[in-house]
Amino acid sequence: MQRKFAWIVVLAFLCPAFMGRSTLIAAAQMADKPTPRKAAAGKAPASKTVDAEGHQWWQHAVFYEIYPRSFADSNNDGIGDLKGITSKLDYLKDLGVDAIWITPCFPSPQVDFGYDVSDYENIDPMYGSLTDFDMLTSEAKKNGIRIILDFVVNHTSDQHKWFLDSKSSRTSEHRDWYIWRDGKEPGKPPNNWTSLFGGSAWTLDATTNQYYYHFFYPQQPDLNWRNAAVKDAMFDVTRFWYKRGVSGFRLDAVDTLFEDPNLHDNPVLPGKNALGDPIEENKYNSKLPEVHDVLRELRKVADENNGVLIGETWTTDIAELNKYYGEGNNELQLPMDFLFTTVNKLSPADFRKQIAAIDSASGWPTFVISNHDIVRSYDRYGDGVHNDQIAKLMAGLYLTLRGTPIIYYGEEIGMKTTPPARKEDVKDPIGRIGWPKEKGRDGERTPMQWDESENAGFSKVAPWLPVPPTAK
């Protein structure tokens, strides 16, 4: 049924008169699941977890990623918010969306646009309040839509109370909640590890004259997951949100939770990256086996709450990906598969190869073709001439393969990547550091285009990022 219906969907996408964009996802869902049954009286559709065939709800679901800054602005301050998302639930329901993944909406200094969390159990005022969040979950449930939160597990903000205490003294209560080390010698960091966002992964703190480790920005110090107190505190965060009605978490950068305690230097590869740093193999600070111990325990908490765990594993190696399912599928239900992101053109041979590899995986696939860190599929797969047709073909393929798709907002209407034309317009720190070779991620984070009114219906004032001139 799945493969046969894929052809029907693809043909429909190639004939625009046959199918409107508002039914794109809903129609494609039919290829991989039975016709949905109406919920029993008094029972919200989102409460059902297993179907008659024993499939979990997330195996039939279409997930939809929302970057809250850019989705819908309810109070006209130029930044999207939770009330904006709530106002668009009818639209999401009509699309056939079963769950929305909301990127971080917690209090944050916004150095990395929310991926530097200063309080895991609240909502950043720019997005609203806990009351607004509760309203969103309540209204979403009425529409049969589940809420998935982005959980930044690897690090906190340097403004989090844990880190502020940790850096205050070598004997502080939270000192060992982060990774502190002496330098190799005065003025030199403990090893050669580099930050993903440029420069050394070690920053010297003048107060205690020790270095702290950060895989990402200096304002994002890594948590020490070898400390049981850290694990307990972070597990409690998930329980807090489960009680508020969420159905699971997307675990950010889950592969970087552990580092080699002996701090061996990483192997250095030839050349420089786009930020001008040596290219290194993250042998000693990524994908260490200890992460699987944490995932097994976190899965138990998820199972107790009927929750789903999606993992950002950043691997295109099927053998490595399989490890994140765990033995007997006791770790992540949905480790994110980035194989399609390695294909940058519509090549049947390349896609056939990747699909065959995905089908060899030990668990249920979770495909990624676009998100807030990746150039939109419209541009990546397009040839500059037939982009509209290619986008429709990709949608048909993506939504009818065995597995769970995650649609990035705006993909359903063919939104394009629009990077800034000038360095002074760049908001993403990566783009400011790496310009012009690396222009950052602003281009794939522009406001959702709702209609043909001013600012494409996103806001009545100038948005935090400009609406592309190609919007229509």
What are these regions (language model features)?
Residues M1-K4, E304:
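Positively charged n-region of N-terminal signal peptides that target proteins for export
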Residues I8-R21:
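Bacterial N-terminal signal peptides
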Residues S22-A28:
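Boundary at the C-terminal end of the N-terminal hydrophobic targeting segment
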Residues G54, W58-Q59, N262-Y284, H292-A302, ...:
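Loop/helix patches that line or flank the sugar-binding groove of alpha-linked glycan CAZymes
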Residues I100, F249-L251:
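Hydrophobic residues within beta-strands of alpha/beta enzymes
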Residues L164-N209, V343-S360, G431-P469:
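Core domains of carbohydrate- and sulfate-ester-processing enzymes
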